[in-house]
Amino acid sequence: MSNRITVGLDGSGADTAAADWAAHEAELRGAALELVHAEDWAQYGPFTVPLPEPREQWAEELLSRTRDRLLREHGTLDISTHGTKGLAASKVLASSAADADLLVLGSRGLGAIAGFIVGSTGSATIPETDTPVVLVRSLDGQDSPPRHAGDAGPVVLGVDLRSNCDRLLAFACEEADRRACPLVVVHGWSLPPVFSYAPVLDPGVEKEMADGLETTLSELLRPWEKKYPRLALDARIVLGQPAIQILDAASGAALVVVGRRIRRPALGARIGPITHAVMHHATSPVAVVAHD
């Protein structure tokens, strides 16, 4: 990795939130910050139509204006800019972030009930890159995110005990340790479908299954507790839909961390339903970490 954070800009109101969060995170990490803007050329059959000159000038001004503002507020940061045109924005962002530690994108709020829009570029970029992607919220048209990278609140991690969680745990533990805040690890689970046919469920069965999951989670976390002895770990095994349990735990979180399986299926990479729900409904910044 290059000790660099890349943030994608598209000129929307969510840009300010994403750039501010990325700048705070870069200060926490002692990392450089790269501002990236990509313009797609219009497609007409096999031909592409270059952008008009005013649009190119606007893109250059967007990058320079954002850089100048961040330097006024974070004078010690090393900030670079990169603009490109003619390629799909998701491809450009994924390529720019290939050797970065983090890619930061904005998402726009629709209100407390509707949730957030993760734009088409963001949705296309996340499956394209193995770099962790953080989605930063802009609420109700406001430019500022609800939480900056250094704000109080725990880091909340959603895990699936059936998957390899090492990369998620490494990312979440490091983020919580960097912020000197607790790490809440949540695993939501449901009873196997066969139990739905039982007229009366033996309460001992549910307890036995929950105890087994708690043991599994404790064993999973043990090496990380040794690696981060100062980290306050709160492990939770909760009966219920995983996305709902993660969102409940994420209220007031500094950062929410969820996973995305690294897959290359014939129909293309995708984002799983739990991560998709958290991306669209968590009010805190959401980190999507690719894992095996």
Indicate where each model-derived feature is located.
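Short glycine-/small-residue-rich Rossmann-like dinucleotide-binding loops
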Residues: 10, 67, 108, 160, ...
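Generic structural signal for helix capping and beta-alpha/helix-loop junctions
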Residues: 43, 143, 193, 245, ...
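A conserved short alpha-helical segment within the catalytic HATPase_c
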Residues: 63, 67, 218-222
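General small-molecule cofactor/ligand-binding pocket signal
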Residues: 34-36, 80-84, 134, 184-186, ...
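A short acidic, glycine-rich active-site loop
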Residues: 52-62, 203-213
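Gly/Ser-rich helix-loop-strand patches that form or flank binding pockets
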Residues: 19, 24-28, 95-145, 250-292
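Small/aliphatic-rich secondary-structure junction motif
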Residues: 1-52, 151-203, 225, 232, ...
